[in-house]
């Protein structure tokens, strides 16, 4: 099995606790509400929402994909960290076994948040991950993040 690791870091004006509540804890409700063309729904197939939980994410009509399944590894509400794996679905190509994601939201000195993400692609055999595959995923995630950030700015009393 081969692999590829991609790290990214960006900032937000939204405080880390508020952003974590929306971006991680309530994403299954918030994203279909603000971006139904991207995510139609999210449902828990196994578990209680904590570590070990398996979720099915059904994409909206504007997506090239039908669904994916996530397995949650950890959620740390105090340290604002979250990790899960994409374990099934048509977003995984024939060459990718799974993708592990780790997200950490760090309070920034200016009152906002530094968002640190790591994506680990586990390939079947020694297949190389195409840069455009990673770039496309990054752009979609960035777009969703900007929608969440915009929603929080437009609704300052939510997720406090």
Swiss-Prot record:
- Which Gene3D superfamilies does the UniProt record give? 3.30.530.20
Determine if Calcium is one of this entry's keywords: no
Question: Which keywords does this Swiss-Prot/TrEMBL entry list?
Answer: Allergen, Pathogenesis-related protein, Plant defense
State one molecular function term (GO): protein phosphatase inhibitor activity
**Which SUPFAM superfamilies does this one have?**
Bet v1-like (SSF55961)
By its UniProt entry, which CDD domains does this protein fall under?
Bet_v1-like (cd07816)
For this record, an example GO cellular component is: cytoplasm
Q: Which BP terms in the Gene Ontology apply to this protein?
A: abscisic acid-activated signaling pathway; defense response
* Record InterPro entries: Bet_v_I/MLP, Bet_v_I_allergen, Plant_def-hormone_signal, START-like_dom_sf
Which top-level group of life is the source organism from?
Eukaryota
Question: Has the keyword tRNA processing been applied to this entry?
Answer: no
Q: How does it assemble?
A: Monomer.
Q: What family does the database annotate? A: Belongs to the BetVI family.
State what protein this is by name.
Major strawberry allergen Fra a 1-D
């Amino acid at each position: 099995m081969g692999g590829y690791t991609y790290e990214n870091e960006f900032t937000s004006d939204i405080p880390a606790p508020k952003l974590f509540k929306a971006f991680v804890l309530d994403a299954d409700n918030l994203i279909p509400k603000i971006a139904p063309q991207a995510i139609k729904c999210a449902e828990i197939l196994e578990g209680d929402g904590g570590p070990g939980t398996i979720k099915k994410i059904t994409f909206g009509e504007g997506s090239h994909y039908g669904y994916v399944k996530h397995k949650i590894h950890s959620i740390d509400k105090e340290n604002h960290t979250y990790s899960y794996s994409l374990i099934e679905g048509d977003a995984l190509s024939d060459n990718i076994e799974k993708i592990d994601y780790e997200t950490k939201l760090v309070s920034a000195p200016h009152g906002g948040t530094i968002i640190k993400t790591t994506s680990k692609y586990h390939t079947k055999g020694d297949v190389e991950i195409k840069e455009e595959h990673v770039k496309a995923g990054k752009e979609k995630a960035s777009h969703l993040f900007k929608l969440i950030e915009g929603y929080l700015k437009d609704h300052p009393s939510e997720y406090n």
